[in-house]
């Protein structure tokens, strides 16, 4: 029986790719990529020429059975996403769950993920926190925010820059305008930035500077 490797890839800076991640990808029989075009650039940079197949939220329910069967037959499969660690607000959970059900060994390599550096650099309490990822766009959004109104721990959210001010404004409505917040963007890139302050202050910053 083969094995499934979950391989983190850089969230911005290619120097964050680990030696082990490169080796695993070069040794894999098949690389599952969220977007083969995006991952193709990464693989080309590190001279990785192994077979690659798209694996994303729109096709994973159809392809997971075939992939599991290939691993059962002895193949080594590596799963990557466009950036960061697969399964963290990215495809990955479904195939990992099915591999575990089938008794297939799953190894997740340590490596890049966006929320850890953002949290540590925020200056907000990080000994206890809750990760919420992306909020629902429509249905369930208000319900989710309402359920979090009494949450005292540091909460971590992902958001598109195009929806940032709208989401921060909702946070002020549900969590209080004076709640401290940190917005981290362009993580590990040249223009990395963390904007810290109350929700009122940070909303004003991005309203004026976007």
Functional labels for PLM-detected ranges:
Residues 53-62, 134-136:
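Conserved helicase motor
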